[in-house]
Swiss-Prot record:
Subcellular location(s) of the protein: Cytoplasm
Gene: recF
PROSITE patterns from the UniProt entry: RECF_1 (PS00617), RECF_2 (PS00618)
GO cellular component: cytoplasm
Binding site for ATP: 30-37
InterPro entries linked to this entry: DNA-binding_RecF, DNA-binding_RecF_CS, P-loop_NTPase, RecF/RecN/SMC_N, RecF_2
Name of this chain's protein: DNA replication and repair protein RecF
Role, per record: The RecF protein is involved in DNA metabolism; it is required for DNA replication and normal SOS inducibility. RecF binds preferentially to single-stranded, linear DNA. It also seems to bind ATP.
Length: 365
C-alpha cells in the first residue's frame, strides 16, 4: 500500500489541509503543539476507526466546528482507492470508494497502519490484556476472519459466564462447544503469529543491538512447542471439565485465551522489570518493524509505518540504527521536534507550524 494524499477538514487544529506524501520516508518536524501528531492520528483513525489518543472521536473536532472529515487516496496492488471518515455528535460515516462501511470489522485491514508511539510502553508495562490486544490488532489487520473469530469467542465467553452466574450447568455445557471451537482457533493463531513474529523480531534486533530478545505466547491450552488446532481443542475441553467446579465457585470462566500472556524477555529476563527505558523503547520500535515485515511476508500486506515523536523515545544512536532498518519497510511517516538529517533522494521532509505544513525537501513531489 502507498498513501498518495491525506485531506483534513476541521480535524484537531487543522481547518483545511491537503498533504501529498512521498513513497518512502516522510519526516515531519516542528515545535510541540503545532499539529504533527494530529497527522498520524488521522491516518490511524482511517485505519481502525478509532484514535490512539482519546476514546471519543468527537474530541478531535476542531473547536467551533460541527464535524471533522478525513480522507486518504492510496494505491494497493496498482489500484487506486479512496477512504474517508466523517465524525459528528451523531456518530461516524465511513466510505470506501464511495460505498458505506457500517462495521469496524469491515474497515480493519483496508488501510493498514502500524503506529509506534511513546504510549506503546503499555505493551511492556501494562496488564496482559495490553499484550493480547497487540496480537489481536495485528492478526485483525491480516485477516477480517480473525476479527470474526475473536468476536464470536467473546460472545460465547460472555454467555458461558452468564450461565455460570445463574448456576445453570446445562447452559454451561451447551456454551462449551462454541467456546472451545473459537477459543482454540484464537489461541492457535496467536501462537503461530508469535512464533513467526519472534523469528523476525530476533533477526531485526540482532541487526541493531546485541542483547538476546525473545517473544513467547504463554497459554494453559498449549503444552507443546508446535501443537495442532486439535491438540489445543482437546486441552481446552479437558481444562474446562477440570475447572467446572471452581468456575461455579468464582462466577466466571478461569481458562481460555482471554487469560493468556505474551512474554517478552531480554537476556532471559522479563523486559518490564530488567530493561532500561531506552531498551524498552528500542524493543517496541523493533516490534513495530517486525509487525510490518510479518504482514509483508505472510500476507503480502504492505502497511504504512508511523513513528511519533521519535527523538523523545529513542537516543540518536538507536534512532540511526532503526531508521536504517526502516529503509526496507516501504512507506514511513515520522514526527519529531528536530529537523532530520537523514536526507536522501527518496525522503521527504515537512515542517509544521500552527497547523501549516510546508515541504522542505525535495522542492516538489
Amino acid at each position: 500500500m502507498r498513501v498518495l494524499s491525506l485531506f483534513l477538514k476541521d480535524f484537531r487544529n487543522y481547518t483545511d489541509l491537503r498533504l501529498e506524501l512521498g513513497p518512502e520516508m516522510n519526516s515531519i518536524f516542528g515545535l510541540n503543539a503545532q499539529g504533527k501528531t494530529n497527522l498520524l492520528e488521522a491516518l490511524y483513525i482511517l485505519s481502525l476507526g478509532r484514535s490512539f489518543r482519546t476514546s471519543r472521536l468527537t474530541d478531535a473536532i476542531r473547536f467551533g466546528a460541527s464535524h471533522f472529515f478525513i480522507e486518504a487516496v492510496f494505491s494497493h496492488k496498482e489500484v487506486f482507492h479512496t477512504l474517508s471518515i466523517q465524525v459528528d455528535k451523531k456518530g461516524k460515516k465511513i466510505l470506501f470508494d464511495g460505498a458505506p462501511i457500517t462495521k469496524l470489522s469491515e474497515l480493519v485491514g483496508l488501510f493498514p497502519v502500524i503506529l509506534f508511539s511513546i504510549k506503546d510502553i503499555a505493551i511492556i508495562e501494562g496488564s496482559p490484556s495490553e499484550r493480547r490486544r497487540f496480537l489481536d490488532l495485528l492478526l485483525a489487520q491480516a485477516s477480517d476472519k480473525y476479527t470474526e473469530h475473536i468476536s464470536l469467542y467473546h460472545k460465547a465467553l460472555d454467555q458461558r459466564n452468564a450461565s455460570i452466574k445463574a448456576q445453570n450447568q446445562k447452559a454451561i455445557s451447551a456454551w462449551n462447544s462454541p467456546l472451545i471451537a473459537y477459543g482454540s482457533l484464537v489461541a492457535f493463531l496467536r501462537n503461530e503469529c508469535t512464533k513467526k513474529l519472534n523469528t523476525i523480531f530476533q533477526t531485526l534486533w540482532d541487526n541493531t543491538l546485541k542483547e538476546t530478545l525473545s517473544l513467547r505466547y504463554e497459554s494453559s491450552l498449549i503444552t507443546e512447542e508446535s501443537p495442532t488446532l486439535n491438540d489445543i481443542a482437546s486441552n481446552y475441553y479437558e481444562q474446562l471439565r477440570i475447572a467446572n467446579t471452581k468456575d461455579l465457585d468464582l462466577g466466571y470462566t478461569m481458562v481460555g485465551p482471554h487469560r493468556d500472556e505474551l512474554l517478552l524477555t531480554i537476556n532471559d529476563l522479563p523486559v518490564a522489570k530488567f530493561s532500561s527505558e531506552g531498551q524498552k523503547h528500542s524493543l517496541l520500535a523493533v516490534l513495530r518493524f517486525a509487525e510490518c515485515v510479518y504482514l509483508q511476508e505472510e500476507f503480502c500486506i504492505h502497511p504504512l509505518l508511523c513513528m511519533d515523536d521519535i527523538h523523545a523515545c529513542l537516543d540518536q544512536q538507536r534512532l540511526d540504527q532503526l531508521l536504517q532498518l526502516s529503509n526496507s519497510l516501504g512507506q514511513v511517516v515520522t514526527t519529531s521536534t528536530i529537523c532530520p538529517d537523514h536526507r536522501s533522494t527518496t525522503s521527504c521532509i515537512f515542517h509544521v507550524t500552527q497547523a501549516q505544513v510546508s515541504l522542505v525537501a525535495p522542492q516538489s513531489l
